[in-house]
């Protein structure tokens, strides 16, 4: 079973809380609808997955973005979200984020979160 699948199942079972904002939900849906995922998930499966996340996660407003925190300006909102929601960890597979050594909260890869859980 893949690391993302294991984390998803642990989240569904209540092992940790997931915090999202509208911008993150939009990004998730957009990524899952990219051509490279068409052979893996149907549009209906994407709709169902996004709805499960939307219903089950803690939803907060889009954060005030702190610019220049990350190398990719499109990722700055993720750090702002994690900070404004006062979470323990920001979990991301993006190396630009996981390489941030001085950001709070700490950025963990999905595998590192799985190790902690």
Residue ranges, per PLM feature:
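Residue-level detector of structured alpha->beta connecting loops
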Residues: 15, 54, 86-87
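Acidic, metal-associated active-site segment
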Residues: 72-90
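Acidic, metal-coordinating catalytic cores used for nucleic-acid/nucleotide bond scission
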Residues: 68-74, 97
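Short, well-structured N-terminal submotif of metal-dependent ribonuclease cores
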Residues: 1-20
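A short secondary-structure junction motif
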Residues: 1, 23-44
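Acidic, PIN/NYN-like endoribonuclease modules and their adjacent C-terminal/linker elements
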Residues: 84-91, 95-117
């Amino acid at each position: 079973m893949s690391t993302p699948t294991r984390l998803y199942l642990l989240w569904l079972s209540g092992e940790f809380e997931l915090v999202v904002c509208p911008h993150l939900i939009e990004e998730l849906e957009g990524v899952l609808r990219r051509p490279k995922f068409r052979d893996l998930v149907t549009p209906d499966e994407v709709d169902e997955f996004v709805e499960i996340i939307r219903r089950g996660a803690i939803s907060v407003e889009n954060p005030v973005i702190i610019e220049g925190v990350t190398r990719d300006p499109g990722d700055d909102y993720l750090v702002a979200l994690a900070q404004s929601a006062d979470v323990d960890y920001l979990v991301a597979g993006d190396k630009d984020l996981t390489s941030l050594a001085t950001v709070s909260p700490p950025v963990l890869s999905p595998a590192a979160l799985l190790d902690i859980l």
